[in-house]
Amino acid sequence: MAAELEGSKCLSGLLSGLAQDTFYGHPGITEELLRSQLYPEVSLEEFRPFLAKMKGILKSIASADMDFNQLEAFLTALTKKQGGITSEQAAVISKFWKSHKTKIRESLMNQSCWDRGLRSLSWRVDGKSQSRHSAQIHTPVAIMELEIGKSGQESEFLCLEFDEVKVNQVLKKLSEVEESISTLMQPA
C-alpha cells in the first residue's frame, strides 16, 4: 500500500483534485473519482485515510497562507512525525504549493468577500462647462469614477462630481479618519 501511494504524479494529481474541490468550487471532484483515476489499485478503505491526511495538510498550508520557509518547516515536522508523510511526498506538496499558492490565495480571498468591493478608482479635475448659474461656469470640479463589483460578476460604475467646497470637506473627513487610525495604532 505505501509504495502505491508514493507516486509523485499521482500525488500531484490528487493535490490538484483536492484544490479543485476544496478551493475552486468544482463539485464534480469526488473521493471515488480521485481514487479510480489516480489510485485504482488501492482499496477505498486504504485510500480514505490517505485522502483525509492530504486534504488536512493542504487546508493547513492554505489557511495559514504559509510562505516557503514556513512550508519547509511544516513539511519537515510532518516527515519526522510518526504516521506523517515521506520526504518524497513532502517534495511533491512543496512543489504543488509553490506553483498554486497565488491562485489558491486569490480563491480564498474571493470566497471570504461577502459583498461588493472597490475594484478601481479614477479621478480628474475639469472646468465646469454648464450650470444653471452663469457664475459657476469655468469653475474647477473634481470628477471621481468608482468601479464597484464582486469577483466573477459585472461591475457597476458610480460617477461623482465635487466642487471645491465638497473636496475640502472630503479631505477634512479623510484627515479625521487618518488621525483616528493613527491613535488606535499607537502602542499602549
UniProtKB/Swiss-Prot annotation:
Residue sites binding Cu cation per the record: 100, 109, 133
CDD domains linked to this entry: Commd1_MURR1
Modification(s) after translation: Ubiquitinated; undergoes both 'Lys-63'- and 'Lys-48'-linked polyubiquitination. Ubiquitinated by XIAP, leading to its proteasomal degradation.
One family name in Pfam for this protein: COMM_domain
Localization annotation: Nucleus; Cytoplasm; Endosome membrane; Cytoplasmic vesicle
Coiled-coil positions: none
Gene Ontology biological process terms, A to Z: copper ion homeostasis; negative regulation of NF-kappaB transcription factor activity; negative regulation of protein localization to cell surface; negative regulation of sodium ion transmembrane transport; positive regulation of protein ubiquitination; protein transport; regulation of proteasomal ubiquitin-dependent protein catabolic process
Annotated GO CC locations: Cul2-RING ubiquitin ligase complex; cytoplasm; early endosome; endosome; endosome membrane; nucleus; recycling endosome
Keyword presence, Coiled coil: no
Annotated segments matching region Required for binding to PtdIns(4,5)P2: 124-188
Cited InterPro entries: COMM, COMMD1_N, Murr1
Segments forming domain COMM: 117-185
PANTHER family: COMM DOMAIN-CONTAINING PROTEIN 1
Function: Scaffold protein in the commander complex that is essential for endosomal recycling of transmembrane cargos; the commander complex is composed of the CCC subcomplex and the retriever subcomplex. Can modulate activity of cullin-RING E3 ubiquitin ligase (CRL) complexes by displacing CAND1; in vitro promotes CRL E3 activity and dissociates CAND1 from CUL1 and CUL2. Promotes ubiquitination of NF-kappa-B subunit RELA and its subsequent proteasomal degradation. Down-regulates NF-kappa-B activity. Involved in the regulation of membrane expression and ubiquitination of SLC12A2.
Similarity section: Belongs to the COMM domain-containing protein 1 family.
Subunit annotation: Component of the commander complex consisting of the CCC subcomplex and the retriever subcomplex. Component of the CCC (COMMD/CCDC22/CCDC93) subcomplex consisting of COMMD1, COMMD2, COMMD3, COMMD4, COMMD5, COMMD6, COMMD7, COMMD8, COMMD9, COMMD10, CCDC22 and CCDC93; within the complex forms a heterodimer with COMMD6. Interacts with VPS35L; the interaction associates the CCC complex with the retriever complex. Identified in a complex with an E3 ubiquitin ligase complex composed of TCEB1/elongin C, CUL2, SOCS1 and RBX1; in the complex interacts directly with SOCS1 and CUL2.
Name of the protein described by the UniProt record: COMM domain-containing protein 1
